[in-house]
Amino acid sequence: MRQKIFLFVRSLIILYLILFIGEGIAKLIPIGIPGSIFGLLILFIGLTTQIIKVDWVFFGASLLIRYMAVLFVPVSVGVMKYSDLLVSHASSLLIPNIVSTCVTLLVIGFLGDYLFSLNSFTRLRKKAIKKRDINNVNNKGEAS
């Protein structure tokens, strides 16, 4: 029991420390990117370079992910509270969201097409096509 408490406290301290460092960077560099995003980038870089061990943050992160839906309840209540404001500004909210979604889909589509056209991705492309063909055969067999 003490071991689990230690793991939980250690992982939360590390996660919050990274969050506060990200908030500090966001205050030092006022470019409109939230501190939590800087914190996520620091965490990502730390995990990929293995400066931060996965075991150090796994217990707290998995607990937070498990209860993520509960953590979004206040946000949902806030959206419902200001629904009249959202409806009155619907066009100024929806148009940028739709445009940015379409641009993102196009960029990802072209990037994927480019990456799959490279010679180094030939093996990956063959593997993906083989998996797709197997899924198509299985789906046709289930439909009959």
UniProtKB/Swiss-Prot annotation:
InterPro entries, per the entry: LrgA/CidA (IPR005538), Uncharacterised_UPF0299 (IPR022957)
Residue stretches spanning the membrane: 5-25, 28-48, 57-77, 92-112
Keywords: Cell inner membrane, Cell membrane, Membrane, Transmembrane, Transmembrane helix
Pfam family name, one: LrgA
Single GO cellular component term: plasma membrane
UniProt membrane topology term: Multi-pass membrane protein
Main location: membrane
Location(s), subcellular: Cell inner membrane
Similarity comment: Belongs to the UPF0299 family.
Alphabetized HAMAP family for the sequence: UPF0299 (MF_01144)
Name of the protein in its database record: UPF0299 membrane protein MS1271
Species this chain originates from: Mannheimia succiniciproducens (strain KCTC 0769BP / MBEL55E)
